[in-house]
């Protein structure tokens, strides 16, 4: 499989905030990128080709339930190629979940990215 991983500006902003707060977060996210390159549709399907992925934040020592959530969108060009957009990332202890309207707004940002 040959999937490119891209981000949108709001994801980059949230990533920067979490990376400053949790020193291990960039390495935690690099593990996620590795997982996505092997299985683009990892996580829980939440509709519109979007998936919610639970990841641990090693420096929090709380496991997946107290870790972060990443919302992805998978656009398949064919069976072997596509693009994975990283739409949102949030700390589970700071934000309970993400609404359908927020996801729709994030999907609109793909077009302008």
Q: Model-found features: residue ranges?
A:
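Basic/aromatic recognition patch in beta-strand/loop cores that engages polyanionic ligands
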Residues: 41-87
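Arg/Lys-rich, positively charged N-terminal/basic patches that mediate binding to nucleic acids
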Residues: 1-28
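Compact soluble domain cores
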Residues: 24-42
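Enriched for short, Lys/Arg-rich terminal
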Residues: 68, 73-113
